[in-house]
Amino acid sequence: MNMLTEAAVEKALDQKMSNVPYKMIGQDVSVYYGEKRALFDVNLNIRENTVTALIGPSGCGKSTFLRSLNRMNDTIEGCRVAGKITLDGDDIYDPDIDVVELRARVGMVFQKPNPFPKSIYENVSYGPRIHGLAKSKADLDQIVESSLQRAGLWNEVKDRVHESGTGLSGGQQQRLCIARAVAVSPEVILMDEPCSALDPIATAKVEELIHELRENYTIVIVTHSMQQAARVSQRTAMFHLGNLVEENDTDKMFTNPDDPRTQDYIMGRFG
């Protein structure tokens, strides 16, 4: 491929991505833990039905930003968020926002699989029940089956859905947590290093699942694995020392980043 053709392809990809609407918009987002400032005026927009990877060295602020997107930072004593984050134009930090409803719309999958100490069925049905999404037992059964299918787990557990979720393998437990998240029909799914505790085979299954989920959900993933970010995301944002260094199409970020700090991090020169 000659340089002219490469430039044309890159321009076409940029144009295609620029037409994707924003699902969430972060404006001048700063986060404080007590007197310590962890994020500095971050401006980052999350595109709809797109996987956005947040990368950067430990302590750079990427997980702090992720938790700000569904107000999980509210659970940390002394944490304060400044700036503005909107979901479909609505300020998620507005005092009138129902935080429980927000977290149903913006689900979270954590670093370590954390199934409830209940059956597989109860793990998935819990959210729909408390949010009133099922009018009957048949409705609930359908939601559970559909969610487990979307998480790529149904065929592995359909004959034992009333057994404990904690008896599953680590990779299965993480997919159960993803099924639990999608059961309440979220619009956005946040993933905080979802594969860090998994073996390569389980990781591959979760990454394949992320590709499939992108068709119906907007996904934001924090990862320390550059290879994973390159494999699963369409957009990548680089954080360093609480600042957003740059955000761009993933292909460009990994081949021709705008900031030398991004290049140094990707090449393993620090982090």
From Swiss-Prot:
GO function terms (MF aspect): ATP binding; ATP hydrolysis activity; ATPase-coupled phosphate ion transmembrane transporter activity
Annotated ATP binding sites: 56-63
SUPFAM superfamilies hit by this protein: P-loop containing nucleoside triphosphate hydrolases
Subcellular location(s) per record: Cell inner membrane
Enzyme's top EC category: translocase
Classification via CDD domains: ABC_PstB_phosphate_transporter
One Pfam family, short name: ABC_tran
Reactions it catalyzes: phosphate(out) + ATP + H2O = ADP + 2 phosphate(in) + H(+)
EC numbers, comma separated: 7.3.2.1
GO cellular component, as recorded: plasma membrane
Topology term for the membrane: Peripheral membrane protein
Location, primary (coarse class): membrane
Biological process terms in GO annotation: phosphate ion transmembrane transport
Keywords noted in UniProt: ATP-binding, Cell inner membrane, Cell membrane, Membrane, Nucleotide-binding, Phosphate transport, Translocase, Transport
Residue ranges occupied by any ABC transporter domain in the UniProt entry: 24-266
Role description: Part of the ABC transporter complex PstSACB involved in phosphate import. Responsible for energy coupling to the transport system.
Record-stated family: Belongs to the ABC transporter superfamily. Phosphate importer (TC 3.A.1.7) family.
Self-association state and partner proteins as the record states: The complex is composed of two ATP-binding proteins (PstB), two transmembrane proteins (PstC and PstA) and a solute-binding protein (PstS).
PANTHER family hit by this protein: ABC TRANSPORTER I FAMILY MEMBER 17 (PTHR43423:SF1)
Name listed for the protein in its UniProt record: Phosphate import ATP-binding protein PstB
Gene field: pstB
